[in-house]
Amino acid sequence: MAKRAVQHADLKAVPMLLNESLYVGIDIGKAKHVAGFLSKTLLERHERFEACPALVFENSREGFRLLIERIRSLAPLEHIFVLMERTGHYHRTLEQYLQELDITVYVMHVQSRSTGMLKTDKRDALTLANQLYNQLELGVQVPNKLQLIRRVVPPTQAAAELRGLIRHRYELIHESTRRKNKLTAICDELFPELVRVVKDPNGQVALALRERFPTPAALATVSLTTLQQIRGGARSISSAKLLELQRQAAQSIGIKEVARLRGLVLEQTQLIKELQMLQEHIQQLDKEIGGIVEHAREGQILLSFPGIGPIMAATSIAAIGSIHNFPSAAALKSYFGWAPVVAQSGSTLDHTRLTHGGARTMKHMLFLAVFQAIRLKDNEWARLYERLVKTKCPFDERTQSYLGKTRVIGRVAGQMTEAIYALLKRDAELLSKVPPSQDPPPPLLYDPEVHRQHRLGHYRPLKSTPPPNTITLLHPFPAQ
């Protein structure tokens, strides 16, 4: 009879790799994930990274605990480095769980796979672990920037709140635009003469008239007093325009077929209600977003810039996440899509243009911010724009105007991005030095006077002046 194994309650599992780092690559799935483990010892033992151990675990709390138990059996948690591939939103829960345990997490935009027949989740996970091992342990450089790993920095509280709200607002705006396009198409069939009197057929007063009187015949027979009551206090449509609208409705060439007319009227009524509901939700979101931006330190900094409003500031905060994600102002400009690209061959400089990459939303938002600052006139950004236009843009004698003014906006947007980065970076460094029990000082806002002094040549850096370099002479030891 075989002897039963003696169990010792005082024995504890000791990690295999106590003094070396463990690199974990995780292939993300919807229901299950696959983790591959790689280290210098494991690579020497198995000779190939494809033969290193792997673990399949579920996308649940029990699965996450199983992963942590397996990791602890191999190495301490402070020696763990995890790499995941961005795949939609499925990686976010695991990323948050690992960061709560103070595990260093890296992400990669897309994984480069060899063109072969073999494609398994285990191989993908071990390939990610090998990428992490090569770039962190061996310092291997990769020519493709999409293959670079990037450490995940938790977003600020304001960025975490605004990310979902800004994304939802963008979707509501998109749906609202779709409804407006459909309503415009219906108006072209039912009452094409409406746009001759009313500039926007989807305006508030126009929608109220179209909802109350969906056909030109119904609009032509109503009294002027009723139309004035529907118009309310809005003066965008005068009484004369209302009379002209009735005259156009009486002789409208809109569709008259009864079957088609009933379908268009029903569709128009439903679309108007959907559009009004979407606009109401957008107003609620704007109010919530404005409150978050006003109370956030990053929001106060961004709102101090001329031309930047609450929605622009909220979009910037949500896109940046944490300013520690960007090591320099050039990285932030590249992410915003306002970095210059130089085409050069030898000693010849062919041309310089703006990069085609970057976040499209941020590129659009920053363009609007610069354009609004230029329209305000009385600020340093507008003066910089006017000076650059006279310097960089050719003057057309025939039209007596400068050509290519929009190209100068890229230069102004780049400098505004640098100023935003400097203030956000300084504020983040200031907060990192404040003890938890102490209230932080107010943030340093954009100061037009300091900006004007900078442009005049009196530059004052935001960082404290480093101590001057000194040379200390060491006297030789006396001869014994």
Model-predicted segments: where are they?
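A detector of single, family-specific signature residues
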Residues: 1-480
